[in-house]
């Protein structure tokens, strides 16, 4: 993910960033204007990294100011530069630290590998009844035919419900299937386990869920990869994970390095399912992998976004507010947002058309009768109101 950072006052830049930019340019002529521009560009890149972006969009002139510190990424080959430079400038005008550029290249190669990989197809004819929602059905179809699957959706759209049925179908197709389920944090892994166990108890899955599947463990991603205190995974490209299916919940929390380590360890003929909502939990470190992957056109067949939320009623104000916040332009000021919210959500829901029952107009008229109405006029209204209940009176009389 790239970003554009406007120049900031030096008072707003952390001291360590200032010091590092000066250290990187210590061999430059301190009197030359390009030296200051180079330092400013480095500072902007560091600020962008702090915000979770892996690169910064800059002009060719800004990149040129970095002189011997930067090299141009090869636009026609996937090969890495012959020599290692601190910074990489690619054909999309994005400036990287070499480390994050190299991680993105590795991850991209694994995505291409999985996209092109032929996987054993699963016949879903006998499982058509398991899911009714067309998007959930599409998710099952995708996993049955693709090695890489991205299942996204907001709260209450049935991600875990759908996953339970997907896993049950895969388990029925291959009773000896080896499944790994993990999440970036221990808390997320525990929630995943509890939610799946509840879903596996559905009577509709009774014939598909085995005792082994009911006892399926969930791990943290670090434990799955065998990462110790030195953050070096025990499983990698030369020693891949021993699983046929790998499921990662809360995948929005995957940063660039962790995602690359994960995909390094995905073996051939393995299905990997990323489950999450990019609008919710974000990664702590650099890179928002799930959000970036779901916007790649070439992966359209590898992604299903669940649409229908069952957490609140259709048209509920809380749902409208959530969608409004997600669509809000991040550049809008707080005061503008409040005014816009009042216009779009609050005022729009104050006046609602009310459909009255047949007898309600008479009730309303009685409530708003003038105080000086005569007894005769009031009696006429009462008789008119009673007509609506004549059938009930007759039945009681009988």
Where are these regions (language model features)?
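Hydrophobic anchor at the beta1->P-loop junction of P-loop NTPases
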Residues: 151, 181
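Conserved helicase motor core of P-loop NTPases
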Residues: 279, 283-398
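Interdomain "pre-motor" coupling segment immediately N-terminal to P-loop NTPase/helicase cores
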Residues: 62-122
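Walker B catalytic acidic pair
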Residues: 249-250, 276
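N-terminal pre-P-loop "Q-motif" helix
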Residues: 130-145
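Hydrophobic positions on the alpha1 helix immediately C-terminal to the Walker A/P-loop
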Residues: 162, 166
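Inter-Walker segment of RecA-like/P-loop motor cores
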Residues: 183-242
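Conserved lysine of the Walker
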Residues: 159
